[in-house]
């Protein structure tokens, strides 16, 4: 498994395969999945974290069932751009996953994704209890949608480059 940049992922992704977004928390892993055209992110179930081995197995089973081509995992960078303990934990999780799968990972700056997800859920008048259940997958969708938009931008740039004289 490799940790790729978004540009490297854009070059390597096979067509018509889904990409998964992950919001790694201490108690849960929020998951979202793209459509086959990689335009839209849809929230999915949450994996309740137990220990790394069980978490990895649940994630890999999900990836196999959904035919996931890559994972976009939120990197919880501090507002000032520095990396704290949560970033270190995310990087360690990705490193450990690398021993279990060949599916590539992309680290995606997730600043304010949970805040944005919570605002949307509040605007949808979702109760506090239901918000708590859905927030991680909603945040994973924000992470994935940002990455999908970047992939689309890279694809437009690549097709524009081919037309240049």
From Swiss-Prot:
It holds the Pfam family RuvX. Gene3D superfamilies: YqgF/RNase H-like domain. Its EC number is 3.1.-.-. One of its GO terms (molecular function) is nuclease activity. It is an enzyme of class 3 (hydrolase). GO terms for biological process: rRNA 5'-end processing. Its main location: cytoplasm. Keywords: Cytoplasm, Hydrolase, Nuclease, Ribosome biogenesis. It is found in: Cytoplasm. GO terms for cellular component: cytosol. InterPro entries: RNaseH-like_sf, YqgF, YqgF/RNaseH-like_dom, YqgF/RNaseH-like_dom_sf. HAMAP family: Nuclease_YqgF. Belongs to the YqgF nuclease family. Could be a nuclease involved in processing of the 5'-end of pre-16S rRNA. NCBIfam families: RNAse_H_YqgF. This is Putative pre-16S rRNA nuclease. It comes from Rhizobium meliloti (strain 1021) (Ensifer meliloti).
């Amino acid at each position: 498994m490799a940790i790729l940049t978004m540009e490297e992922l854009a070059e390597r992704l096979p067509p018509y395969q889904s990409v998964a977004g992950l919001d790694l928390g201490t108690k849960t892993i929020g998951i979202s999945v793209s459509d086959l055209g990689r335009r839209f992110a849809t929230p999915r179930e949450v994996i309740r974290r137990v220990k790394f081995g069980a978490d990895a197995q649940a994630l890999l089973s999900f990836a196999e069932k959904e035919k996931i081509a890559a994972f976009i995992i939120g990197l919880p960078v501090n507002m000032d751009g520095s990396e704290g303990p949560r970033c270190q934990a995310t990087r360690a999780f990705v490193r450990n996953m690398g021993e279990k799968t060949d599916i590539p990972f992309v680290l995606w700056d997730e600043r304010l994704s949970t805040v944005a997800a919570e605002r949307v859920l509040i605007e949808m008048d979702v109760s506090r209890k239901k918000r708590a259940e859905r927030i991680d997958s909603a945040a994973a969708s924000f992470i994935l949608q940002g990455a999908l938009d970047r992939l689309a931008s890279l694809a437009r740039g690549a097709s524009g480059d081919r037309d240049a004289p």
